[in-house]
């Protein structure tokens, strides 16, 4: 479970990599592959595997979802700059969430334009499938989650003109 602004959300999956700052995990929804998520460890409030989860875990393993831990894109997660350098050549859309702002939670889906020391420059595609004219400078300190490989972003990537 993750918590910010007194809101808790859960990610179900197999952990892949852990650093002092971040955790990379597979994401599984209803026994279906939903890509990968990288979240800040400071937002993680609970990690658990209940006895009742063992049956669900066996289903996921039988469906081959545990094999997703061998993904090739992100191997080191010590800093956001390091993570974005590894995702720079990812053949798909990346989603960035900035959830800690009380007045506005920002969601970006698109491609990395440039990687700076404290920000990532990001080209965003709207929900209408049209590229935003503006390139967004997203400060690392605002980023709460990075995800990729999920069906939502894969469908947009497939149908949005490059």
Predicted regions located by residue number:
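Short beta-strand-centered aromatic/proline hotspots
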Residues: 9-17, 107-113
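Preference for intrinsically disordered or flexible, low-complexity segments
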Residues: 16-20, 114-118, 142
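Extended, basic/helix-rich recognition subdomains
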Residues: 109-125, 129-130, 134
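Short glycine-rich, low-complexity segments
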Residues: 1-10, 22-24, 28-104, 126-162
